[in-house]
Amino acid sequence: MLTEEELIQIRRHLHQIPELALQEFDTHQYLVETIAGFNQAFLEVRTFKELPTALMVLVHGKNPQRTIGYRTDIDALPVEEQTGLPYSSTHPGVMHACGHDIHMTVALGVLNYFSEHQPQDNILFFFQPAEESENGGKRAYELGLFSGKWKPDEFYGLHDNPDLPAGAIGCRMGTLFAGTTEVNIDLNGKGGHAAYPQNANDTVVAAASLILQVQTVISRSIDPIQSGVITLGKIDGGTIRNVIAGHTRIEGTIRGLTQTMIETIDNRLKDVCEGIGCSFNMDVSLELNQGGYWPVENNPELTKRFIHYMEETPTVNFIETEPAMTGEDFGYLLAKFPGTMFWLGVEDDSQLHSATLTPNEKAIKRGVDAITGFLEYRMQN
C-alpha cells in the first residue's frame, strides 16, 4: 500500500502538470505509468481512441456479485497559480485550482490498495477528463464507454472541500451539488436615433422588463423550502448614448437542486421570453445549455449505507453537510447509475477555483483509508 509520503509525492507531481479539459495528455501518461507500477495480477487497463485522455481500470474480484464504480476527474482550470509553492504548476495559466490533483491521488491510493488486496467484487476506476468543461462524464456515457464488464452497478466519487477539516468526510442524503444551466437570451428589435423612439424598437427597455420579470420565477414558481436561483450576470446592448439599441444580449445561469426543479425553471423562463417578445413586438430567442451538469442526487439506499459506515468508524471524522449550489458533472452519471458523492475535507483558507488554493495534504491518506474501508464494508453489506 502506498505510504503517506508516496501519496504526497504523487499529488505534487500531478499538481505540476495541470491540463485543461480534453488536453490532459501528460496527466493521462503519468496515470498510466503509475498504475503500471502496481501489482497487475487482477488489473485490466483500458484506454479509448474516441476519448484519448480517459482511462479505466478494472480490478477483478475474487467472486464478484457486482461492479462498484469509483470516479475521479483529472482536468484543471485556466488559472495562473499564485501559491508560491516549490511544486507549483509548470504550465503557465493553468492550475489544479479545484483540487483534482487531490482527487486523482486518492483514487490511485485506493486502486493501489485493491491491487494488493484482491476485492470480493469487481471495482471499476474511471479517470474522467473534462469535468470543468466539455461535459466529460456525459461524453463518456454517450460514447458507450460504460458497457459490458465496464458498466458499474453503483458509482462513487468525491470532491475536496477547503471548508472541512483535513481528512473529514462530508455527505448528505439527497442533493450534494446543484445542477447548472447556462442561459443566453438575444433580443432583436430595431435600432434608431434616440430622438425618434417611435421609429425604433428598443431592446434595452425590453431587456430591462425581462430581467425584472425573471425575478418572479423563483419566488412564485419554486417551493420556498427548496433552493433555486437564476442569475443574469451579463447584459450587452447598444453602442452609443444617443442610439437606440436594435440588439441586446443577456447571459446568466440557472441552478437548482433537482432536475425537475431545473426543468420547471427552464419552462418558466421560456414563458417569460415569449411574453416579452409579444409585449414588445420583437424576436426574443432563448438558448439553454445544461450539458452534463445535472444535480448530484445521491441514491437514498446507498447513501444511507455510506453515511452509516462513516459515522460508525472511529477513525473517520464524519460531517453532515448542506447542499452546494455549485455544479459537478458527476450528476449526469448518477442519473444513469445509482451512487453517492461525498466531500473530502482539505482545510484551507482559500476557496475552490482560487489561485492560492493549497489543500492540506494530510487529507490524502485519511481519504484513502476511509474509502478503502468503506468499499471493503460495502462488499460485505
Swiss-Prot record:
<keyword id="KW-0378">Hydrolase</keyword>
<dbReference type="Pfam" id="PF07687">
    <property type="entry name" value="M20_dimer"/>
</dbReference>
<dbReference type="InterPro" id="IPR023905">
    <property type="entry name" value="AcetylDAP_deacetylase"/>
</dbReference>
<dbReference type="Pfam" id="PF01546">
    <property type="entry name" value="Peptidase_M20"/>
</dbReference>
<protein>
    <recommendedName>
        <fullName>N-acetyldiaminopimelate deacetylase</fullName>
        <ecNumber>3.5.1.47</ecNumber>
    </recommendedName>
</protein>
<dbReference type="InterPro" id="IPR017439">
    <property type="entry name" value="Amidohydrolase"/>
</dbReference>
<dbReference type="InterPro" id="IPR002933">
    <property type="entry name" value="Peptidase_M20"/>
</dbReference>
<keyword id="KW-0457">Lysine biosynthesis</keyword>
<feature type="active site">
    <location>
        <position position="73"/>
    </location>
</feature>
<keyword id="KW-0028">Amino-acid biosynthesis</keyword>
<comment type="pathway">
    <text>Amino-acid biosynthesis; L-lysine biosynthesis via DAP pathway; LL-2,6-diaminopimelate from (S)-tetrahydrodipicolinate (acetylase route): step 3/3.</text>
</comment>
<comment type="function">
    <text>Catalyzes the conversion of N-acetyl-diaminopimelate to diaminopimelate and acetate.</text>
</comment>
<dbReference type="GO" id="GO:0009089">
    <property type="term" value="P:lysine biosynthetic process via diaminopimelate"/>
</dbReference>
<dbReference type="GO" id="GO:0019877">
    <property type="term" value="P:diaminopimelate biosynthetic process"/>
</dbReference>
<dbReference type="InterPro" id="IPR011650">
    <property type="entry name" value="Peptidase_M20_dimer"/>
</dbReference>
<feature type="active site" description="Proton acceptor">
    <location>
        <position position="132"/>
    </location>
</feature>
<keyword id="KW-0220">Diaminopimelate biosynthesis</keyword>
<dbReference type="InterPro" id="IPR036264">
    <property type="entry name" value="Bact_exopeptidase_dim_dom"/>
</dbReference>
<comment type="similarity">
    <text>Belongs to the peptidase M20A family. N-acetyldiaminopimelate deacetylase subfamily.</text>
</comment>
<dbReference type="GO" id="GO:0050118">
    <property type="term" value="F:N-acetyldiaminopimelate deacetylase activity"/>
</dbReference>
